[in-house]
Amino acid sequence: MTSVSDCFQSLRDRRQCALIPFITAGDPDLETTAKALRLLDASGADLIELGVPYSDPLADGPVIQAAATRALGRGVKLEDVLGVVKEVSPEIKAPIILFTYYNPIFYRGVEAFLQQVKAAGVQGLVVPDLPLEEAESLLKPAHEVGIAVTLLVAPTSPIERIEAIARQSQGFIYLVSVTGVTGMRSQVTSRVKELLTSLRSATDKPIGVGFGISKPEHALQVKNWGADAVIVGSAMVKRLAEGTPEEGLKAIGAFCQDLKQALKEDQ
């Protein structure tokens, strides 16, 4: 498995936009999570974001909150999630990025947490409730063990804050396309295009756009606006949760392929 930075560099060399699907670990069960990681990798995912179920997911919309609630109801813990990553990571090409709130990191201690996730094969972290002002306590030790901590840019952020986040973010920059929580939207606001332009003037780091992207045409639109990656969460989680686990897997495999095909289309 390659690092997050190496993956983006390879894609840039080939002038390709990365597809980053998101799923919630443990929904509907851990066995299906392992199968889903393998399937997404085989269906065109360039990186995969794996959500750790959490009881108070402030950044997540109803679809991902419900998935986390179901997983927690089955007793899924961080150690279980990392067990799946350890099993699957040697078999797939796509780097796994763990999406986790800060409390599990704080509870275990930064150093112990990083050693634990590194040993499992995690290549990156997204911590949505980690403020920029406190990020250094995680960024520096994570960098030392080879884990990229990607920071989020909100659409309401002033340019000075955008520039500060761009300087510190590792691997890529996560541009949140909408104010509020994750979830499916009917369209992607043109504000994203403006934000991509502002960010691009501040950094040459890869920029991924997430929150609200739910259709192949959204993915193509954001790519054509200049994004280096498209992150698809709620629409993926919703498909995986519908029907039997086998039906859910079939649905996300087909959806992932459709998204990948859209990203290959010319403007």
Swiss-Prot record:
Enzyme class: lyase
Record GO cellular component, one term: cytosol
Keywords carried by this UniProt record: Amino-acid biosynthesis, Aromatic amino acid biosynthesis, Lyase, Tryptophan biosynthesis
Assigned EC number: 4.2.1.20
PROSITE patterns the UniProt entry points to: TRP_SYNTHASE_ALPHA (PS00167)
GO molecular function, a single term: tryptophan synthase activity
Pfam families linked to this entry: Trp_syntA
Active site: 49 (proton acceptor), 60 (proton acceptor)
Gene3D superfamilies (alphabetical): Aldolase class I (3.20.20.70)
Pathway where it operates: Amino-acid biosynthesis; L-tryptophan biosynthesis; L-tryptophan from chorismate: step 5/5
InterPro entries (UniProt xref): Aldolase_TIM, RibuloseP-bd_barrel, Trp_synthase_alpha_AS, Trp_synthase_suA
Subunit relationships: Tetramer of two alpha and two beta chains.
Purpose of the protein: The alpha subunit is responsible for the aldol cleavage of indoleglycerol phosphate to indole and glyceraldehyde 3-phosphate.
Protein's recorded name: Tryptophan synthase alpha chain
Source organism phylogeny: Bacteria, Bacillati, Cyanobacteriota, Cyanophyceae, Oscillatoriophycideae
Gene of this entry: trpA
